[in-house]
Amino acid sequence: LDGTTLNNNSELTQETIDTLHAVKNLGHEVAIVTGRPYRNSKQYYDQLNLGGPIANFNGALCHIPGMPEWDGKYHITLDSEFVLDLVAFNKTLPVDYLMVEGTELVYSDMEELPECPYYPKDQKPIVIGKNTKLQEQPTAVALFSDIEKQPEIKSKILDRYDNDIEIR
């Protein structure tokens, strides 16, 4: 969505809508792929009304809303123990804040998230700590810091987890 389908104001233009519908009318299946969670892309999916699959969380969740029986549906989650260990380890890193997301819930080490179009506006995060009982399997973890601190953070995380994770 971002940087392609949506304009600089995070809106769909009529030209984009018409183009995607023209492609569908030629017999092609149109899929939406985004790094956003579904809750932050649902409005665009509904507005486009194409009926095809949507992949969220950079491909960790793929589904067709309203079709739970779709054979192509999948959801790759993270191990809860790993996530809670990373939450505890995060306290030793030069990170401004951390977010853990599931399909429905948002956890953070902050009570209030900064203003951002990618965060739910109508949902406060659940404050997370080492002993938090996660109410759903997490799909994504994001650590936020100044760009100059990111190489150090990445190195320390990869050292701790034996390069078993991918950092983007």
Show which residues each predicted segment covers:
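Short, surface-exposed acidic/glycine-rich loop or hinge patches that mediate macromolecular interfaces
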Residues: S10, G35, I147-E148
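Conserved acidic, metal-coordinating active-site core of Asp-based
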Residues: P94-R168
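Conserved strand-to-helix beginnings and helix N-cap segments that scaffold or border functional pockets
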Residues: N9-T16, K154
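Active-site phosphate-binding/coordination module
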Residues: Q14-P114
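Asp-based phosphoryl-transfer active-site loop
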Residues: L1-S10, I32
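Short, flexible active-site loop motifs that bind/organize anionic cofactors or intermediates
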Residues: N7, A31, K73, A140-L143
